[in-house]
Amino acid sequence: MRNAILYIIIISVCSCDIFQDAEDMGIYPVNYKILSLGDSYTIGQSVCDECNFPMQLKDSLQNTLRLDTLNVEIIAVTGWTTTALINSVDPVLENNSPDNIFKENDLVTLLIGVNNQYQNRPFELYENEFPELVNKAISLTKSQSSNDLIVISIPDYAYTPFGQSGPNPSITSQEIDMYNTFAENHCLENGINFINTTDISRQGLIN
């Protein structure tokens, strides 16, 4: 299941405008920077440092595209809500040092919200803070364009042994859908790339 989700992410990234433009011109970026923002799904809780999806994405892109260097930075911690991620991104945006490694990215990925749901935070908090995070993420791209941001849907942990041990997995799935629907609609309305990994995550109990 994890490989299937990664495959969808990679295919979507490779179809982004920056790669299409480079292909049309017969060239590829020489140096490429990716920043991944999120929580445990991004950092890869309980997996090796090279096994999380940003690092696997890096390896796949290096094998696919002619890049001299490809650097990946991650701002993500297990348990982070949208509020916690905002509090960590703000100092990055305020740091105007030329040594700030988190700015001027060719691609930014954003996967956030599962802990808002899990910690029973008011949904209105996500409605307010997700669009704010999207804008901050765009500000961290080199182009300052929504074309270079990819939002990834929240996987459904109800379809894991942990999720099945909870009091009501079906409620978890309904709430995950509510978060993802809001995020997807916001992305559609603002021309932002949105990748749905939730459907594949719901095969977790059979794969």
Regions found by a protein language model. Name each.
Residues 12-15:
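C-terminal motif of bacterial Sec signal peptides marking the signal peptidase cleavage site
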Residues 90-207:
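Alpha-helical cap/lid subdomain in secreted, periplasmic
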Residues 2-8:
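Sec-dependent signal peptide recognition
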